[in-house]
A protein has these predicted regions:
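Portal/gating segments that form or line small-molecule/metal binding sites
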Residues: 1-132, 142-183
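Conserved catalytic/dimer-interface elements of ABC ATPase nucleotide-binding domains
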Residues: 137
Length: 183
């Protein structure tokens, strides 16, 4: 079975949405290398509808000259989890809608190979709750923004995890990798 790796840019206060705050920290080579290592094994990209609709116009016209990440996002099959979007392929090539969230369907996709998830906080919460995330990569930026969507919102269930790795990056970002809690 393939691995499911999640990538989130987050603030120290846990906010993961509208990450324009990342721009203040640049995109140094060590950050690019960390993300490259995370995405390299991906045979598919799993996205929630909202993230898909934000990524499609941003990535679909980019070339490798614009951004080294463009081939990953444009050439890799994208699976969109949505109960409302039915024709993802007409929005962004190599995209397919897989229907509303279904843990069994995600397991089937994992059987086909490694999956990469970026953003998609609602989807990620469900994946974590169902034990489908093998690696949760949090790129923690040294800023608190005070409000916004959190990956693990207040009032959510207790979610124990195990630290798999920690890396300090040159721009002050901490790359923390977590996996399912071990007994």
């Amino acid at each position: 079975m393939g691995a499911l790796r999640v990538h989130e840019f987050t603030t120290v206060d846990g906010v993961v949405d509208a990450p324009m705050w990342t721009m203040d920290y640049g995109f140094p080579d060590d950050l690019a290398a960390s993300i490259g290592a995370l995405t390299a094994p991906a045979q598919g990209i799993l996205l929630g509808r909202t993230t898909f609709e934000m990524f499609a116009p941003a990535w679909s016209t980019r070339t490798v000259e614009d951004d080294p990440g463009a081939p990953l996002f444009n050439d890799t099959t994208k699976y969109v989890v949505s109960s409302t979007l039915t024709d993802a392929g007409s929005v962004w090539r190599n995209s397919t809608a897989v229907g509303g969230y279904d843990a069994g369907r995600i397991r089937e996709l994992k059987e086909q190979g490694d999956l990469y998830v970026s953003g998609s906080a609602t989807l990620v919460r469900a994946l974590v709750a169902d034990g489908l995330v093998d690696e949760l990569h949090l790129f923690v930026y040294p800023v608190a923004v005070g409000s916004g969507i959190r990956l693990f919102p207040e009032g959510g269930p207790r979610t124990p995890l195990s630290l798999l790795g920690a890396e300090g990056l040159s721009n002050g970002v901490a790359h923390l990798t977590y996996g399912p809690a071990t007994a």
